[in-house]
């Protein structure tokens, strides 16, 4: 499949890369890392990375603005996005051919060409693997691409602490870090936290609920976000902070936005992506998300999570 992707990429003069809404480091790393590789390899081609910028990650890369006409005859590549409704910039079907590169379970097999590898730690890891295959075809990796891909791997592996970190992951990271970017500066930019977000994190620890079966939950409503001067995105990024609490088997964050309640599931053992799918979401076995539209649904999610944790005893 990698060879077919490389061959297809070589055929198009215009290539537009997308990723998911509310991007994380892996979304930026895979989309923009591949953008840099292709620009370095094919300077004669028109290569664009599109989507709504995420302010906390804007230091990684500047995205492009593309008019509708540019999609005519273009190859569109979507990175790190399992479901079509989560693709940032819904013009993605407007090109001549659509390619999906992802590491989530392939529940929505959209696109003309698909490369899905659920064993990969991140799509950024997959992009580096694609580059290694592409080297035989003249592909080039510059320092910016290496930094972006490394950032994506770091983000999705939780700084190499999550169980999705493999021998291959560490091998690739070791090769990427040989490029002349500052990994320490990158870590500082990725993980430096504003004081108001730290205070919100304190609120989270003070208000977490934990059942005897190991199901934990936190509710962050709009008035709480306003009190601490934080965004829903900043609050959602704190979901991993509960992972070190003794006795937790799985947990859920509810973050209220203007038109929905964002739900973030995490687990130390029970498989939770089936629960996320039940509420029109999805994701990985131990890290998933969904969106709901009433607090009654939140109560049902808590009941389901409780059952899931109890059955995992």
UniProtKB/Swiss-Prot annotation:
It catalyses: adenosine 3',5'-bisphosphate + H2O = AMP + phosphate. SUPFAM superfamilies: DHH phosphoesterases. Its cofactor is Mn(2+). GO terms for molecular function: 3'(2'),5'-bisphosphate nucleotidase activity; exonuclease activity; nucleic acid binding. It comes from the Bacteria. Tetramer. This is Bifunctional oligoribonuclease and PAP phosphatase NrnA. It comes from Bacillus subtilis (strain 168). The gene is nrnA.
């Amino acid at each position: 499949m990698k060879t077919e992707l490389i061959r297809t990429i070589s055929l198009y003069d215009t290539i537009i890369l997308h990723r998911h809404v509310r991007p994380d480091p892996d979304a930026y790393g895979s989309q923009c890392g591949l953008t840099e590789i292709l620009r370095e390899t094919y300077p004669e081609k028109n290569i664009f990375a599109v989507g709504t910028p995420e302010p906390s990650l804007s230091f990684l890369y500047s995205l492009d603005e593309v008019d509708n006409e540019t999609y005519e005859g273009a190859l569109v590549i979507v990175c790190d996005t399992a479901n079509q409704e989560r693709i940032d910039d819904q013009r993605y079907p407007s090109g001549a051919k659509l390619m999906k590169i992802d590491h989530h379970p392939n529940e929505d097999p959209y696109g003309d060409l698909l490369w899905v590898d659920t064993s990969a730690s991140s799509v950024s890891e997959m992009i580096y693997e694609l580059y290694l295959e592409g080297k035989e075809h003249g592909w080039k990796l510059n320092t910016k691409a290496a930094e972006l891909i490394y950032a994506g791997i770091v983000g999705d592996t939780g700084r190499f602490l999550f169980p999705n970190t493999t021998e291959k992951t560490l091998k690739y990271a070791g090769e990427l870090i040989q490029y002349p970017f500052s990994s320490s500066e990158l870590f500082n930019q990725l993980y430096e936290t504003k004081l108001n977000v730290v205070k919100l994190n304190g609120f989270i620890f003070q208000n977490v609920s934990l059942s005897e079966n190991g199901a934990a939950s936190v509710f962050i409503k709009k008035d709480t976000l306003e009190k601490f001067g934080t965004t829903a995105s900043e609050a959602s990024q704190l979901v991993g902070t509960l992972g070190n609490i003794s006795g937790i088997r799985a947990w859920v964050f509810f973050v209220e936005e203007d038109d929905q309640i964002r739900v973030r599931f995490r687990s130390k053992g029970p498989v939770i992506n089936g629960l996320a799918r039940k509420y029109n979401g999805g994701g990985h076995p131990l890290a998933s998300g969904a969106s709901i539209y009433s607090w009654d649904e939140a109560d049902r999610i808590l009941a389901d999570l409780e059952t899931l944790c109890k059955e995992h005893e």
